[in-house]
A protein has these predicted regions:
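Glycine-rich, positively charged N-terminal anion/phosphate-binding segment
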Residues: 22-33, 48-124
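Alpha/beta enzyme core
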Residues: 62, 112-126, 130-142, 150-228
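Short, solvent-exposed helix-helix connector turns and helix-capping sites enriched
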Residues: 82-86, 149-150, 200, 214, ...
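Active-site beta-loop-alpha junctions enriched in small/polar residues
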Residues: 48, 74-76, 104-106, 131-133, ...
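Alpha/beta catalytic cores of nucleotide-metabolism and tRNA/nucleoside-modifying enzymes
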Residues: 2-39, 43, 49, 55, ...
């Protein structure tokens, strides 16, 4: 049963008149389909390395509104080698459906075999990573570097599509740099070889996460295809930013990664907005504390207490920043080594409350900053 938190706050006001036009278009569209897979909403959780693990996917699903959730990016060769660390990335549960696994690699045979392994394990959809900008991925011919190898990349996509019966999608960027904006051409070719959908992040590899998303570039990808859905991605942290993505690109769906870290309620807000033009606010301090504790318990279930404490620090940082927790208490939780120390830190956080905003009301919006270039550490 979805978990809706403790909210008693009023709905946010109706958005602009242009919002109604966007909503009318969305409501007139047929359901979002990845091949034969029908998605319950057009609001998707993007793959985000280190964050979109099973515990977090369970949380956003409980809050509602997610049409599809995708894993962290997964090394195709690691899957075939049965690496325990890699296999943990694809763990799922009954509540985590439908879900996709995003794989990366530059060898068509390895990618094909990894796709077949995933299909045998019951995965609903496979996503090919063509967007990761970090050097450790691109230097092995994977991620965004695939956008520089047209023939090989099309052959890779075809090999994966033809090897499985489940839908195969691609996530890519606009291109390698501003002189190689190859996304529209790739999208056309992907449609021809049977790719079910394309998600497009509106920056180049050279940009990393710097600058602003180029929605005009995303629109060119939308216009390049005839049938398959295009998913807009990048800088969608609020309903208003999502509305703008729909309005300026004509995309069929949107996906969020960093925005969902700051506001796990974002998917439900979009569903409410699409249906009514209004949406309920994000969670309060108390709501977020409940979510933090719940996600930590899911991590304990999956990894055991010691590994959960270590691995959860990365996620806890963003929870606590969004909750406006003092730096000293954030540090206390980050330094916890035992279950007792972790629980004590949470008790202290609950006792002190937020340093800004109020415990039961709206909190200031959190902006998750990232490095300017193609950097894995943020």
């Amino acid at each position: 049963m979805p978990f809706y938190g403790l909210r008693t706050l009023p709905h946010m006001p109706v958005l602009s008149e242009s919002s109604a036009t966007v909503r009318d278009r969305l409501l007139s569209l047929p359901p979002l389909l990845y091949g034969g897979l029908k998605l319950e909403s057009r609001y998707l959780l993007s793959p985000l390395a280190g964050y979109t693990n099973l515990p977090f996917r369970r949380i956003v699903r409980e809050l509602g509104g997610v049409g599809l959730a995708t894993t962290d990016l997964v090394n195709a060769r690691g899957l075939l080698d049965r690496s325990p660390k890699t296999l943990q990335l694809i763990e799922t549960c009954l509540a985590d459906r439908p879900f996709a696994v995003q794989i990366f690699g530059g060898d068509p045979v390895i990618m094909r075999d990894a796709a077949q392994l995933l299909e045998a394990r019951g995965v609903d959809s496979i996503d090919i990573n063509m967007g990761c900008p970090v050097s450790r991925i691109t230097k092995v011919g994977a991620g965004a570097s695939l956008m520089c190898q047209a023939d090989r990349t099309i052959d890779l996509a075809r090999a994966v599509v033809e090897s499985v019966k489940i839908p195969v999608t691609v996530k890519m960027r606009l291109g390698w740099d501003s002189t190689q904006l190859t996304a529209p051409a790739f999208a056309r070719e992907f449609e021809q070889v049977g790719v079910a959908a394309v998600a497009i992040h509106g920056r180049t590899r050279e940009q990393g996460f710097s600058g602003v998303v180029d929605r005009t570039g995303i629109r060119k990808v939308v216009e390049a295809v005839e049938r398959i859905p295009i998913i807009g991605n990048g800088d969608i942290r609020t309903v208003e930013e999502g509305e703008r993505m729909f309005a300026e690109t004509g995309c069929h769906a949107i996906s969020m990664g960093r925005g969902a870290l700051a506001n796990p309620w974002l998917f439900r807000q979009f569903v409410e907005w699409e249906a009514t033009g209004e949406y309920s606010p994000a969670g309060t301090f108390d709501d977020r504390l409940v979510l933090l504790k719940r996600q930590f318990e899911y991590a304990v279930e999956q990894r055991g207490i010691e590994r959960a404490i270590t691995s959860f620090r990365k996620m806890a940082h963003w929870y606590l920043k969004a909750m406006c927790v003092s730096a000293s208490l954030r540090n206390q939780l980050q330094e916890a080594r035992t279950r007792l120390e972790f629980d004590t830190a949470l008790d202290d956080i609950a006792s002190q409350g937020p340093t800004r905003g109020s415990r039961s009301g709206l909190l200031p919006s959190l902006h998750i900053s990232v490095p300017a270039g193609p950097n894995a550490n943020w």
